[in-house]
């Protein structure tokens, strides 16, 4: 992950070392940003006890407790660092509100997060590995241990996800097909869409991810 800077003129957080025509102040290095993000994902999605958290029904945890948990894990993070991780996350993984923090999606634990329905997207994408295609084409996309299937609104994001595995490919999905079969498509963030299941008949085609230049 990139370093995070704060502009001394306007106060905006940025990944650029310059802003408003002046040098910005580095407040968080990329390595620490990644560590915080990974620990928050683990605790808020799967295992709250990792940071000593207690989640309510909506998946919210106390920010002060989260910061204390990070410190006990050897990460000296203050609220500004935590806010930077949340605010600059390109996939909108986290949410801060009224002294609480939660993961927006990706849970394997039993929480209830309300999402707005996406009624506009016509095509969605899912990044995966070519060797998984036979089972996907037979069963469709299943949430597995998660509560929802994760989909992307654009090809590039799906490819980015697919490249975590060997032989990355992207499956193109007919979103109207999903709706016609009674499946709601939810917008979890600007970069993430969710559905309970994607049946085989809604899978349109498979495209290889291009090699990054």
Swiss-Prot record:
One of its GO terms (biological process) is tRNA splicing, via endonucleolytic cleavage and ligation. Keywords: NAD, Transferase. Pfam families: PTS_2-RNA. GO terms for molecular function: NAD+ poly-ADP-ribosyltransferase activity; tRNA 2'-phosphotransferase activity. It comes from the Archaea. InterPro entries: Ptrans_KptA/Tpt1, RNA_2'-PTrans_C, RNA_2'-PTrans_KptA, RNA_2'-PTrans_N. It is an enzyme of class 2 (transferase). The keyword Zinc-finger does not apply. HAMAP family: KptA. This is Probable RNA 2'-phosphotransferase. The gene is kptA.
């Amino acid at each position: 992950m990139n370093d995070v800077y704060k502009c001394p003129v306007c106060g905006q957080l940025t990944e650029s070392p310059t802003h408003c025509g002046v040098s910005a102040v580095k407040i968080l290095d990329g390595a620490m940003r990644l560590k915080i993000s990974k620990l928050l994902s683990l605790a808020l999605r799967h295992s709250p006890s990792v940071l000593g958290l207690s989640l309510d029904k909506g998946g919210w945890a106390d920010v002060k407790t989260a910061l204390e948990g990070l410190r006990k894990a050897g990460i000296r993070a203050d609220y500004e660092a935590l806010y930077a991780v949340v605010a600059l996350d390109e996939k909108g993984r986290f949410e801060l509100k009224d002294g609480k923090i939660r993961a927006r999606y990706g849970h394997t634990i039993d929480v209830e997060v309300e999402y707005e329905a996406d009624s506009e997207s016509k095509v969605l994408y899912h990044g995966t590995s070519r060797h998984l295609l036979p089972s996907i084409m037979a069963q469709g996309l299943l949430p597995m241990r998660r509560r929802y299937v994760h989909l992307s609104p654009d090809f590039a994001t799906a490819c980015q996800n697919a490249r975590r595995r060997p032989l990355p490919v992207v499956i193109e999905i007919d979103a109207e097909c999903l709706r016609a079969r009674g499946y709601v498509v939810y917008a979890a963030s600007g970069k993430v869409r969710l559905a309970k299941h994607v049946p085989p008949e809604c899978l349109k085609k498979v495209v290889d991810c291009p090699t990054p230049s």
